[in-house]
């Protein structure tokens, strides 16, 4: 068995491509091995795939030296034209013998094919040298790799995320010769970063030699090993000055992707900058300089220190002079950025909130949707309506402000007035920070700066928090953050409804993978809040309210737009349900109903169906539902029935049973008590079966037939309040 080493060296790769390379290369190389070498590596025991910011590496051990010999059957001409009348070979057979260099024509035999019998001959195909196969196929393997973005850098028809500078390819220590573009494979690797590119090539003998030389240079090939090393060094260096660092997986993963020789360097900045909001300081350090801010271990207060990760060749010895030079350089660059942030912050706080609100009149939300000021005006009407729909009962209103006791009517009215004032103030300030200098320069801080400035300008904590949280849900350090209270909820829900419905009006909902205006994300966030906070609200009511109050000057096909909106919401909802591991049939039985409306209610139904699908009553209801559906399937939507025509005892029994469950079901539906609803609906099973056993539905008399179908359709419609049982699979 042999070994194969491939290293593709390039310019600095985008960090997001580094972690994606190993699985892509693994898939491509495994396919090649299976197809060309008959060498399967399903368990990944022989091949290893690595990547850093400058190199992509494939190491294969226990690889076959050559492919095995194979027996192959060669099909010749039809047997009927192979021989002359005297039995001697005819011209077609002679040509077949010459073409395949057959020495002994007695080994030719007949084989049956679809079109008759043919001459055939078995031969041995000699195995090929694996090195030769590799040299022929490696360029194609590289070319098949998929990237988010790639580039041309020579006249050759090749693409790669960055220009390829060298290719190392060895099979048992020998060069596997091939060209990729204008780069020729050899036995050299570029390791050191101290010298010029041309002077720092190192000759490689084999895999062990390669690994040893990388290790000596401090290069960590494995992404996970590099990540663990960086995290460990961050913790140790922070401890030295009694600090901790904020665990930011996104930043760490980015650092892993841009380094191969990670080296930790501490730095510090002037304490005068600590008056700047710490969120702004942290953003400048993390997003713009890729530094890790440090916090006091005892109280988590931001300290004037940071840690940077340099990508330098290590001599495995501590070089204090070098580290000091790097640290001073880091501090100098950071100081320039912090001076900018300090200037923007000081300019902002000279103004008032009203100044920034007025400036939103000049910021366009989107062409055809007005400015952010106009968006805010829409939200001022929409938010109270949503609040009333969600918290319209006394119990909900009293929970909106926990300090208010609503035992009597006057206190309830007082609570409502206070809630509405808070909502109005929250909505008025949601977008003011978009016009600040800081958010203009650091757009990632929208909402965060709004909260900070609102507090500074004397707004209540509830209002300030809602400004930040109306952008929620959002991920932070691997955790999903939701609004903390109902005012944040209403602010987020209202803003997202307005965004989605505005783009519905423009007929600009995202298609395919593209979502440039984050409409899909807004709908998903809206659904997640409704599910997390257990809010029931009618999508149809929101749509109707919205277009009855806004965009009335436009000629709109509201029926079509509503269908588009409901389908868009339903698709996002179904995807979320799938991510929660509900079965597709369970989801479809609820979400595919034409009356799909309330997100949280639909979730409760799906959850109930999932947990009770195997219940005996659900079996019975499914059987009855499908029986009803089979009879009425082609009858249209008739739901009217004439009681005077339905006089058979089975019909009378079924009508009474239907009217009983219809009258009783409303209270269980209102309480979302689907277990009792199932028990109630089960009472219709026996009457339906008795009806089908004794009554013919499709009789010749049209009025009688339609009345019976109308009764059955009415029962189907009632049962759909639980789910569409016909969608369930057993």
Show which residues each predicted segment covers:
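Amphipathic alpha-helical "coupling" segments that flank catalytic cores
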Residues: 1-397, 405-730
């Amino acid at each position: 068995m042999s070994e194969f080493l491939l290293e593709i060296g390039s310019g600095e790769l985008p960090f997001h491509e580094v972690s994606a390379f190993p699985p892509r290369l693994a898939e491509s190389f495994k396919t090649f091995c299976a197809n060309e070498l008959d060498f399967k590596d399903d368990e990944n025991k022989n091949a290893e795939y690595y990547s850093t910011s400058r190199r992509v590496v494939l190491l294969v051990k226990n690889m076959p030296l050559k492919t095995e010999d194979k027996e192959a059957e060669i099909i010749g001409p039809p047997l009927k034209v192979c021989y002359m009348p005297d039995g001697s070979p005819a011209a077609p057979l002679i040509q077949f013998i010459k073409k395949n260099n057959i020495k002994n024509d007695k080994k030719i035999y007949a084989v049956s094919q679809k079109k008759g019998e043919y001459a055939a001959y078995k031969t041995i195909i000699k195995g090929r040298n694996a090195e030769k196969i590799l040299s022929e196929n490696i360029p194609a393997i590289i070319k098949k790799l998929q990237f988010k973005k790639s580039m041309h850098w020579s006249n050759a028809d090749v693409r790669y995320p960055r220009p390829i500078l060298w290719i190392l390819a060895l099979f048992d220590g020998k060069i596997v010769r091939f060209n990729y573009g204008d780069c020729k494979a050899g036995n050299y690797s570029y390791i050191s970063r101290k010298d010029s590119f041309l002077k720092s090539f190192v000759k490689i003998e084999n895999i062990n030699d390669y690994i040893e030389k990388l290790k000596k240079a401090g290069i960590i090939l494995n992404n996970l090993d590099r990540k663990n090393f960086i995290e460990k060094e961050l913790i140790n260096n922070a401890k030295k000055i009694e600090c901790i660092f904020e665990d930011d997986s996104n930043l760490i993963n980015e650092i892993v992707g841009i380094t191969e020789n990670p080296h930790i360097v501490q730095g510090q900045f002037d304490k005068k900058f600590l008056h700047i909001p710490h969120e702004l300081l942290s953003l400048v350090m993390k997003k713009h300089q890729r530094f890790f801010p440090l916090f006091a271990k005892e109280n988590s207060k931001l300290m004037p220190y940071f840690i940077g990760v340099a990508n330098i060749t290590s001599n495995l010895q501590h070089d204090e002079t070098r580290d000091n030079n790097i640290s001073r350089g880091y501090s100098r660059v950071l100081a320039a950025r912090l001076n900018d942030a300090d200037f923007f912050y000081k300019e902002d706080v000279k103004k008032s909130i009203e100044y920034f609100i007025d400036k939103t009149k000049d910021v366009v939300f989107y062409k055809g949707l007005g400015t952010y000021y106009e968006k805010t005006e829409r939200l001022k009407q929409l938010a109270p309506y949503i609040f009333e729909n969600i918290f319209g009962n006394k119990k909900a209103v009293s929970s909106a402000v926990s300090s208010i006791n609503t035992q009597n009517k006057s206190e309830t009215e007082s609570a409502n007035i206070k809630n509405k004032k808070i909502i109005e103030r929250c909505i008025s300030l949601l977008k003011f920070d978009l016009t600040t200098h800081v958010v203009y320069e650091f757009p990632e801080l929208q909402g965060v700066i709004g909260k900070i400035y609102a507090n500074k300008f004397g707004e209540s904590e509830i209002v300030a928090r809602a400004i930040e949280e109306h952008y929620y849900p959002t991920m932070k350090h691997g955790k999903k953050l939701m609004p903390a209270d109902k005012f944040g909820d209403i602010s987020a829900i209202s803003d997202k409804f307005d965004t989605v419905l505005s783009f519905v009006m423009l007929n600009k909902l995202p298609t395919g993978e593209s979502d440039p205006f984050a409409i899909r994300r807004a709908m998903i966030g809206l659904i997640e809040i409704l599910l997390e906070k257990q809010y029931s609200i009618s999508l149809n009511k929101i749509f109707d309210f919205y277009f009855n109050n806004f965009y009335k000057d436009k000629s709109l096909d509201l029926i079509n737009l509503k269908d588009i909106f409901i389908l868009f919401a339903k698709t996002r909802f179904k995807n979320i349900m799938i991510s929660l591991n509900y079965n597709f049939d369970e989801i479809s039985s609820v979400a595919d109903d034409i009356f799909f409306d309330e997100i949280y209610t639909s979730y409760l139904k799906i959850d109930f169906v999932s947990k009770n699908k195997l219940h005996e009553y659900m079996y019975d209801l499914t059987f009855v539902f499908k029986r009803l559906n089979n009879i009425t399937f082609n009858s249209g939507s008739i739901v009217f029935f004439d009681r005077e025509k339905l006089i058979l005892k089975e019909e009378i029994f079924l009508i009474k049973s239907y009217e009983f469950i219809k009258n009783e079901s409303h209270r269980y539906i209102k309480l979302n008590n689907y277990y009792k609803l199932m028990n109630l609906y089960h009472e219709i099973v026996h009457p339906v079966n008795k009806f089908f056993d004794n009554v013919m539905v499709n009789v010749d008399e049209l009025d009688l037939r339609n009345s019976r179908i109308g009764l059955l359709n009415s029962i189907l419609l009632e049962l759909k309040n639980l789910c569409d049982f016909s969608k369930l699979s057993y």
